[in-house]
């Protein structure tokens, strides 16, 4: 009966979305909320918490589907205009993949490539990904999932994230699987193992990065000695000029950086070298140490600073004097959030209590920021 009731609720909610005018769906200023009874009461409670009307309408719809979910507003000190200005001031703050599929998100006039294969994102693209109202849907809202209040993660959910990746069956130096290690590290560090796994997928992709192999120092030495211009995939390497580099780069062999911490710079050479030198400074001479060290870095440098969602780690709206952001990919939070959702959905965990911490800006435009690709 519970399943039948849930299906009926979903169907009725979907039908309501189809039949209602767009102005009601998004709660246009001056319109009456499309709810009655308990739903209207909940909608009004959201507004009393501090959510604007357009947020409250979308979140009430989610509440009808997932009553255990909780939504908390995060009042942002900067205005919307100030935030967009800060996020677009430096070309490298928000980047978009050079793949032609994302061409509509590129800056209109800046044709420079950054970090070996990324263009500056346009102001319109930044506004779109920054605007929380664009992502108050069942899957996309998981970029606001609060790690500080995460419920106990099941191993099945973790294994769903690892499935089909280089981590699925691989073992670490101790003989532990990635799933075993992530469950243990997550518990000991105090950070959701599923979140860690999603971040690893985002950062490492197919698992072929030299930062995972333990021989990246030798690769850098080869790039430097041969003055190699590009990688096999065509990414610019930009090695230092001959005679300008002191020391033996092979000393960086045996170090690992699974979360790509400090992996930035102009060209592949700088990206790998910076990441390896950071790993060396932390003593990450096994993949297991790199896993634990990366998790501790995320906990101490982000979650404890209030940046406890992937959105807040991408778009730092917590600090007032500077930007403290984990990633440059303008769509990174959306991508990671969807991965989190899939893990929950495929393991029937969407009905458990989740807390979503959603930024609210002053001076937001009346309409949501449009998707440049539309």
Predicted feature descriptions by range:
Residues 197-201, 263, 296:
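Generic alpha-helical structural context detector
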């Amino acid at each position: 009966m519970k399943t039948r009731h849930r299906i009926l609720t979903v169907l009725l909610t979907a039908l309501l979305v189809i039949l209602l005018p767009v102005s009601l769906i998004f709660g246009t200023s001056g319109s009456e909320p499309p709810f009655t009874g308990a739903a209207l009461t909940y909608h009004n409670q959201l507004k009393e918490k501090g959510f604007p009307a357009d947020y409250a309408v979308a979140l009430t719809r989610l509440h009808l589907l997932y009553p255990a979910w909780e939504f908390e507003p995060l009042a942002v000190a900067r205005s919307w205009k100030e935030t967009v200005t800060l996020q677009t001031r430096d070309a490298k703050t928000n980047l978009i993949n050079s793949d032609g599929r994302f061409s509509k998100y590129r800056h209109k006039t800046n044709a420079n490539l950054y970090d070996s294969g990324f263009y500056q994102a346009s102001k319109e693209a930044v506004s779109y990904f920054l605007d929380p109202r664009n992502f108050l849907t069942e899957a996309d809202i998981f970029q606001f999932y609060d790690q500080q209040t995460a419920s106990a993660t099941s191993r099945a959910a973790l294994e769903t994230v690892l499935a089909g990746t280089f981590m699925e069956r691989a073992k670490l130096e101790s003989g532990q699987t990635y799933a075993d290690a992530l469950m243990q590290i997550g518990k000991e560090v105090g950070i959701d193992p599923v979140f860690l796994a999603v971040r690893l997928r985002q950062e490492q992709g197919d698992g072929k990065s030299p930062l995972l192999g333990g021989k990246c120092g030798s690769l850098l030495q080869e790039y430097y000695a041969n003055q190699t211009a590009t990688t096999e995939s065509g990414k610019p390497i930009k090695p230092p000029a001959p005679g300008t580099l002191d020391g033996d780069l092979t000393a960086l062999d045996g170090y690992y950086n699974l979360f790509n911490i400090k992996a930035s710079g102009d060209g592949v050479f700088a990206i790998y070298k910076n990441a390896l030198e950071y790993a060396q400074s932390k003593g990450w001479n096994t993949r297991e140490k790199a896993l634990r060290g990366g998790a501790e870095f995320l906990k101490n440098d982000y979650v404890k600073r209030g940046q406890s969602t992937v959105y807040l780690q991408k778009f730092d709206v917590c600090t007032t004097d500077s930007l403290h952001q984990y990633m440059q990919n303008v769509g990174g939070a959306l991508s990671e959030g969807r991965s989190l959702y899939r893990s929950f959905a495929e393991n029937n965990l969407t009905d458990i209590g989740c807390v979503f911490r959603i930024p609210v800006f002053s001076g937001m435009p009346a309409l949501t920021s449009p998707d440049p690709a539309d």
